[in-house]
Amino acid sequence: MTEAEYLANYDPKAFKAQLLTVDAVLFTYHDQQLKVLLVQRSNHPFLGFWGLPGGFIDEHSDQSLEDAALRKLQEKTTVVPPYIEQLCTVGNSHRDVRGWSVTVCYTALMSYQACQIQIDSVTDAKWWPLEDVLQMPLAFDHLQLIEQARERLTQKALYSLVPGFALAEPFTLPELQHVHEVLLGKPIQGKSFRRRVEQADLLIDTGLKRTERGRPANLYRLKSDTASYRFLRNLEC
């Protein structure tokens, strides 16, 4: 039998398939704190519980796992986040009461303002302060996924400007510094942070200014290669 003949007679439904889903931990920065997008479940299991945006793979429209994650996020926010990366894969027999389940989880960042109108117009999606989320009973194992995503983002705050993708552009340097401080849980020396940023050359000066504390502050945008840049030394050095 040739491979073509084998495939012509192959029936994928003859084999029991595990549940395969994607989930996304979407962060933003608003009111000087990190927030996470949660959606309220309208079906069992965990009916009425809050959880991560996500769902099953659509084999007809999704060309990749990331496509599936972006599709689910766009359904809730109407926009595509400027930063997304695969966080982890979790699979076992007990995370979903419907059966053996595998989820591929992504972490993503976007500005609050980018989807504010859409989120404000619905009742089943909401930005929650991260510290509140960590105390909530969530669907499935979503709390553990959020904790893992937070740790990943905290590590990135040490050696990159990735947290800046949670800011609305244009932003000031103090705003960029503060989102790093929120993640690290401690203040960063301002001159040291500015020096790291200038050496990295990852910001575009818009030429605009915003008055903060009586002083005009330059407004910046992130360059396209910001996500891949790593500081030579982390911010704690």
Segments predicted by a language model, with ranges:
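N-terminal strand-loop-strand
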Residues: E5, N9-G51
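Short helix-coil junctions and helix-kink-helix linkers
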Residues: H178-P187
